[in-house]
Swiss-Prot record:
HAMAP family associated with the record: Succ_CoA_beta (MF_00558), Succ_CoA_betaG_euk (MF_03221)
UniProt keyword list: GTP-binding, Ligase, Magnesium, Metal-binding, Mitochondrion, Nucleotide-binding, Tricarboxylic acid cycle
Organism: Columba livia
One Pfam family recorded for the sequence: Ligase_CoA
Top EC class, one word: ligase
Enzyme Commission number(s): 6.2.1.4
Tissue: Widely expressed. Not present in breast muscle.
Name listed for the protein in its UniProt record: Succinate--CoA ligase [GDP-forming] subunit beta, mitochondrial
Entry binding sites for GTP: 16, 49-51, 105
Binding residue positions for Mg(2+): 202, 216
C-alpha cells in the first residue's frame, strides 16, 4: 500500500500524508512528525483483509486508529517482526517488516474508480461506481446499474468531458466535480507512465473539508515493461513468497502452492486452471498450479519435477501439455530424465497433445518407466485421482 501511495503522490495524485517505519521507535517518530488529529497504523504486506487479520503476537487487526503517538509505538511493537494471518495469506501468515503511519482522514463519501486494460475493447477503460469502500464484484451483482464504464482512446487519452462525466456518475457535486475529474486525468497519466495494466482506487473518496483523496490503491504492472520500469520492479519483495515460488522463478516457472495432493505440471495459465478444475470435478485436490510457459527446455522440465517431488504433500503427478510452441518430444525427454535421476516414487500420469506428439509418445513408451498415458484431460484427471485413491 505504501508503495502504491508513493507512486501516486509522485504523479500528483492526492493521497493522505504518511510515513513508513520498520521499527516501533521509527513508528513513534513518524506519528509525532505527522502532527495529525488522528493517526492510522497499517501493517504492510502483500495481502488483503488486514483489518480483520490476527498476529501471532496476539494482536488482533492489522489496521488501527489512535490519537496518541505512544499507542502507535505500542501497536507497532506487536506488529513488526510478527506474522499476520488474513483470508489471503498462507495459514502461518506473512511476516510484517514495515508499517505505514498515516494521517487519518474522515471520509464523508466513498466511491470506486479504476483504469484497466480491457481485451474486449482493445485498450484501456475507466470503471467507476458511486458505491465505494466495498467489494466491486458485489456491487456488479446487486446493483449493476451503479457500475459505469467508459472506453479511453489510446491516442487522445481521457478527454475533459469524459473525466467530468465520470465524476458526475460517481456523485461528486459542485467544485468537487472538477477536482475529481482532475484526479481521474492524473490517474490516467500515471497508468500510462508506469506501464500499468490496472490502477484501482477504492475508496476514491471525499472529505468533510471538501477534498478528493485516493485513500487506497491497487496497481498491477505489465511484466513485459520491466526493461523500462526497473525502479518499480525493484520494489517487488520476493521474501513474502513461498520459497518454492522463488526457486521456480529461477527457471522461468510459475508456481502457486495449493492444499491438495495431486501435482499439476502444465503449459499455459488457462490450461493449468482448467487442469485444477477437472481434478476437483473428479474428486481430487490439486497440490499446486505450475505453469511451464512456452519456449521450454529439457532442463526446465527436470527442475519442475524436482520442485514437485520435494513437496511432501504430493502423492501423484499429472502432466498436461498442449504443444503449440512447446515441443512434446522435449517434454518427454525431460520427463524420462527426471523419473530416472530423481527416482520418482509417486504415480505419474501424462497427457500430451500437439507438436511432435508421436515422437514424444514413442520416447515414453520405450522408456520402460511406469508412466500412465492418458487420451485426453478427462482421462488424465480420472487416472490421477484413482492412483491416489489406491494408496
Amino acid at each position: 500500500e505504501y508503495q502504491s501511495k508513493k507512486i501516486m503522490a509522485d504523479h500528483g495524485v492526492t493521497v493522505q500524508r504518511f510515513f513508513v517505519a520498520d521499527s516501533a521507535n521509527d513508528a513513534l517518530e513518524a506519528a509525532q512528525r505527522l502532527k495529525a488529529k488522528e493517526i492510522v497504523l497499517k501493517a504492510q504486506i502483500l495481502a488483503g483483509g488486514r483489518g480483520k487479520g490476527v498476529f501471532n503476537s496476539g494482536l488482533k487487526g492489522g489496521v488501527h486508529l489512535t490519537k496518541d503517538p505512544k499507542i502507535v509505538e505500542q501497536l507497532a511493537k506487536q506488529m513488526i517482526g510478527y506474522n499476520l494471518s488474513t483470508k489471503q495469506t498462507p495459514k502461518d501468515g506473512v511476516t510484517v517488516k514495515k508499517v505505514m503511519v498515516a494521517e487519518a482522514l474522515n471520509i464523508s463519501r466513498e466511491t470506486y474508480f479504476a483504469i484497466l486494460m480491457d481485451r474486449a475493447c482493445n485498450g484501456p477503460v475507466m470503471v467507476g461506481s458511486p458505491q465505494g469502500g466495498v467489494d466491486i464484484e458485489e456491487v456488479a451483482v446487486t446493483s449493476p446499474e451503479l457500475i459505469f464504464k467508459e472506453e479511453i482512446d489510446i491516442f487522445e487519452g481521457i478527454k475533459d468531458h469524459q473525466a467530468l462525466q465520470m465524476a458526475k456518475n460517481l456523485g461528486f457535486k459542485g467544485p468537487l466535480q472538477q477536482q475529481a475529474a482532475d484526479q481521474i486525468k492524473k490517474l490516467y497519466n500515471l497508468f500510462l507512465k508506469i506501464d500499468a495494466t490496472q490502477v484501482e482506487v477504492n475508496p476514491f473518496g471525499e472529505t468533510p473539508e471538501g477534498q478528493v483523496v485516493c485513500f487506497d490503491a491497487k496497481i498491477n504492472f505489465d511484466d513485459n515493461a520491466e526493461f523500462r520500469q526497473k525502479e518499480i520492479f525493484a520494489m517487488d519483495d520476493k521474501s513474502e513468497n513461498e520459497p518454492i515460488e522463488n526457486e521456480a522463478a529461477k527457471y522461468d516457472l510459475k508456481y502457486i502452492g495449493l492444499d491438495g495432493n495431486i501435482a499439476c505440471f502444465v503449459n499455459g495459465a488457462g490450461l493449468a486452471m482448467a487442469t485444477c478444475d477437472i481434478i476437483s470435478l473428479n474428486g481430487g485436490k490439486p497440490a499446486n498450479f505450475l505453469d511451464l510457459g512456452g519456449g521450454v527446455k529439457e532442463a526446465q522440465v527436470y527442475q519442475a519435477f524436482k520442485l514437485l517431488t520435494a513437496d511432501p504433500k504430493v502423492e501423484a503427478i499429472l502432466v498436461n501439455i498442449f504443444g503449440g510452441i512447446v515441443n512434446c518430444a522435449i517434454i518427454a525427454n525431460g520427463i524420462t530424465r527426471a523419473c530416472r535421476e530423481l527416482e520418482l516414487k509417486v504415480p505419474l500420469v501424462v497427457r500430451l497433445e500437439g507438436t511432435n506428439v508421436h515422437e514424444a509418445q514413442r520416447i515414453l513408451n520405450e522408456s520402460g518407466l511406469p508412466i500412465m498415458s492418458a487420451n485426453d484431460l478427462e482421462d488424465a484427471a480420472k487416472k490421477a485421482v484413482a492412483s491416489v485413491a489406491k494408496k
